Amino acid sequence: MGSGAIACGLARTASDHHEVVVWARSERSAERAGDRVEDARVVTDLADLNGCDVVVEAVAEDAEVKRDMHRRLGEVLPPDAVIATTTSSLSVAELADASGRPQRFGALHVFNPVEKMELVELSFPDAASEGTRSELRELCRRLGKTGIEVPDAPGFVVNRLLFPYLFDAVRMLERDSIEPEAIDTCMKLGAGHPMGPLALLDFIGLDVAAAIGESIGADVPERVRELIEQGRLGRKAGAGFYEYRD
């Protein structure tokens, strides 16, 4: 469910081995999703998901939006369908309760770009059945991913460790008047990271990064908030810490 980078990347990955239906909120979003995912049926009516065995929600990282979506899914899907969310920052237990079927609910936290990133963090409410856990572990295997079960805690493992590091890089930029390229090059060549922290923030999206930071209790740097106010959200907006051209 969704038409963003995570939803479309997951749909492309799954379409190699599964019949895939992509739900989009509007006709415009559906057209965009159709351009990004060739081997999938794109729909705008939730009822069209009724025949799906597993539905993975990848809408905006907003608690109210996600709770409402899971409530609606719980009403239209058959009782044996598994509902999963791509969140890592919101309470899995609360979203599961909103769906009305916590026994058939789990978190399937994939990473962008989905086609290249091997890890999936799996998290479940206490009420999740062993069958549900097994089905999502098996789905990860069929997608060519490594599923690791983690506690239902804000940020899970990766984001809880990652975002304080990313924000520390921004504070270094603010405090020491060092160029973004210098920080990123140091971390790529010195620590072996494939991407520097500031380029990674641009890739994630500064608005998304701020939302995740707030949800896990990390102190979001003022520089990030200023860039968001300026509309410099990162790569998707053409500018963030860096300038981008198509």
PLM regions and their residue ranges:
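Rossmann-fold dinucleotide-binding core
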Residues: 82-151, 159
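Rossmann-like dinucleotide-binding cores of NAD(P)H-dependent redox enzymes
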Residues: 22-39, 124-132, 147, 154-162
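NAD(P)+-binding Rossmann beta1-loop-alpha1 motif at the extreme N-terminus of oxidoreductases
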Residues: 1-41, 76
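Amphipathic alpha-helical segments at domain termini/boundaries
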Residues: 39-54, 135-145, 151-152
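NAD(P)-dependent Rossmann-like dehydrogenase/reductase catalytic/cofactor-binding core
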Residues: 3-5, 10-13, 25, 131, ...
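Rossmann-fold NAD(P) dinucleotide-binding segment
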Residues: 45-105
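Flexible helical/loop "lid" subdomain adjacent to adenine-nucleotide binding pockets
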Residues: 161-177
